[in-house]
Design a protein with these regions (language model features):
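Internal alpha-helical scaffold of NAD(P)-dependent oxidoreductase catalytic cores
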Residues: 91, 132-205, 211, 217-255
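NAD(P)+-binding Rossmann beta1-loop-alpha1 motif at the extreme N-terminus of oxidoreductases
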Residues: 1-47
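Rossmann-like NAD(P)(H) cofactor-binding subdomain of soluble oxidoreductases
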Residues: 52-152
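Interdomain hinge/lid region at the active-site interface
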Residues: 221-307
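Conserved small/polar residues in nucleotide/adenosyl-binding loops
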Residues: 318-324
Length: 328
């Protein structure tokens, strides 16, 4: 089984390192200083309670150097994927599976969902249908990523918490490809349940991303503060309730309620969301997949989203004022 990690940053590097350490045939696509360091000295993984592990993996900037793979984990920021989709083609053979591990509503959401919305395409996450046309939705295996990790310097990844990668076919079947990947991940010491309704799990994680992330970027507050302050908690609540109404219209079952989801965020403690970290580093913000997509789904289901619309407008302007986006 050949597994490629396309985007060997924090999460991609973590799962790739765990798989490689367990004996899987892993390659990675990376760039810059991170790529150079991994080529020279391998990838170092730091985990609490364990000695640092230096893992040698095949790594390249050009996917053509790596050849066709059985599984390709896409672990980039969602907004980056359409721009590199065509460059992934050398990694595919006829039966290659794409493991979609990005945040938010995935581009393939309406593939094999059934009903009148079957095959609907989402411009907020797949402008110009680039992923749908280049990848093809039949290749996709859904994945909800739970671990938190960070690249503390080129070639070194620190695992923070979590070890679950939930998998699921768009049509809900327990396929051979999902079972084989689940076994590989479990052999690497990770949790990898195969879900019949992966979209339900996508929405529960999205609840946190669509509210915690932008509000933290607007306030510079950590999760514990956001969830415990009366006023910011109310903003989180109203956004989640709007999203819940959309999800339920699409057939999603939410196994927990809004208060439980917010309390779960509070329990993480004094943690900066990924969007706040990106803001502080002047990196592009992951807005469309976690907010724009929900706004688009609100329009599709004729569900008003006034609070989500307001937060989307304000955090989008914040994004435009980043040094990387300012006109010189």
């Amino acid at each position: 089984m050949k597994i490629c990690i396309f985007g060997a940053g924090a999460i991609g590097g973590f799962v790739g390192a765990k798989l490689a350490d367990a004996g899987a045939e892993v390659s990675m696509v990376a760039r810059g200083a991170h790529l150079s360091e991994m080529k020279k000295n391998g990838l170092t993984l730091l985990e609490d309670g364990l000695d640092p592990k230096r893992i040698t993996v095949r790594v390249a900037q050009d996917p053509l150097e790596l050849g066709a793979q059985d599984y390709v984990f896409v672990t980039l920021k969602a907004h980056s994927v359409p721009y590199v989709a065509e460059s992934m083609s050398p990694l595919f053979h006829d039966d290659t599976t794409i493991v979609s591990g990005v945040n938010g509503i995935p581009w393939w959401y309406f593939h094999k969902i059934g009903g009148e919305l079957e095959g609907t395409r989402l411009s907020s996450v797949d402008p110009d249908n680039k992923q749908w046309d280049v990848f093809g939705p039949d290749r996709v295996l859904g994945c909800v990523v739970y671990p938190a990790a960070e690249v503390i310097k080129p070639g070194v990844i620190r695992h923070i918490e979590g070890n679950k990668f939930s998998l699921g076919e768009p049509n809900g079947e327990k396929s051979q490809r999902s079972q084989l990947l689940s076994e590989a991940l479990r052999s690497a010491g990770l949790k990898a349940p195969v879900r019949k309704k992966i979209r339900d799990e996508i929405w529960v994680k999205l609840w946190g991303n669509l509210s915690f992330n932008p509000i933290s970027a607007l306030t510079y507050a950590t999760l514990d503060v956001l969830c415990e302050d009366r006023d910011t908690r109310q903003v989180l609540r109203t956004m989640m309730l709007e999203a819940k109404e959309i999800g339920e219209k699409l057939g999603v079952n939410f196994p927990i309620d809004v208060e439980q989801r917010i309390n779960g965020g509070a329990a993480v403690g004094s943690h900066k969301t990924s969007m706040l970290q990106d803001l502080e580093l002047s990196r592009p913000l992951e807005i469309d997949a976690i907010l724009g997509s929900v706004q688009e789904l609100g329009q599709i289901t004729k569900t008003p989203t006034p609070n989500i619309d307001t937060v989307l407008a304000t955090v989008s302007y914040t994004h435009l004022t980043l040094p990387t986006n300012r006109e010189v």
